Design a protein with these regions (language model features):
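Preference for protein termini
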Residues: 1-175, 197-202, 207, 239
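Phosphate-binding loop of NTP-binding sites
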Residues: 143-149, 162-258
Length: 258
């Protein structure tokens, strides 16, 4: 068995429709069967000590390994990934005879990490947005409500009081996600051109750049969730075409789901 990585899932993915953490382990099919059971037991032990409830688990057995995931609060995803790494160390001890990790020390570290990452205002805003049927996008730096020209963005540590907001002003714009094996960028450009011909102000993200109509905002590979957020927070955009690469889908989940 070989630990590959543990990371946040910041949006809907193949495993969940919400945020969480996933860990990839290279192993045989037989090893995966033993690992899944041990991993869940260790994660449940840590989550119980932390007082985390209503957590969902998911696994995906793949050729050459297994993905191990569980849901986590929006403002504790780095800590959740650290829990996954600790669970791997505990499994490595149980199944492979590696040194045993110290549970008490790890628990103290997790509590400190959760306290440092905590952002109850962000969690509350997410709940209020869901209750009002409003799309919320977030990352380490910013959170936004609505999409495109109907959106507003704030620093993630300077969020508004949800009760002060006029929720009806936050609405979506037509948004298309383009994924697949070949031809994504070409399809995005073609669709954006069609929308521009219909007098739309089009935001597009691709492996080449982010653009608003014919103005290139930044040249880079923007086919992941970050590109989607950049386009959908632009106040001029009234339609969006987003290239959605499989790498971003697998590593972080969707950048937007409305």
């Amino acid at each position: 068995m070989q630990f590959l990585d543990a990371r946040r899932l910041t949006g809907p993915s193949l495993l969940f429709d919400t945020h969480g953490t996933v860990m990839d382990i290279a192993c045989s099919a037989d090893e995966a069967d033993r690992l899944v059971s041990a991993w869940k037991k260790h994660v449940e032990r840590m989550l119980s000590a932390l007082g985390w409830n209503d957590i969902e688990f998911a696994t995906a057995k793949l050729a050459g390994g297994v993905s191990l995931a569980f849901t986590a609060p929006l403002d504790a995803l780095y800590a959740a990934s650290a829990i996954n790494e600790w669970a791997w160390a505990a499994c490595d001890h149980q199944l492979n005879g590696a040194d045993a990790p110290d549970f008490s020390a790890a628990l103290a570290e997790m509590r400190d990490a959760i306290a440092e990452e905590a952002n109850p205002a962000l969690v509350d805003l997410e709940a209020r947005a869901a209750a009002n049927g409003v799309t919320m996008l977030w990352d380490d730096d910013e959170a936004s409500l609505g999409l495109g020209r109907h959106s507003q963005t704030w620093p993630v540590r300077e969020l508004p009081d949800p009760q002060s907001l006029e929720w009806s002003q936050f609405r979506d714009v037509p948004t298309a996600l383009v994924t697949g094996t070949n031809g994504k960028t070409t399809t995005v450009r073609l669709a954006a051109h069609i929308l521009r011909a219909a007098d739309r102000t089009v935001g597009m993200s691709s492996t080449d750049y982010i653009a608003i109509n014919n103005e290139v905002v930044d040249r880079d590979d923007w086919s992941g969730p970050g590109g989607a957020r950049n386009v959908l927070r632009h106040k001029a955009v009234d339609a969006a075409i987003l290239e959605t690469a499989r790498g971003g889908l697998l590593r972080r989940g969707l950048g937007v789901c409305t």
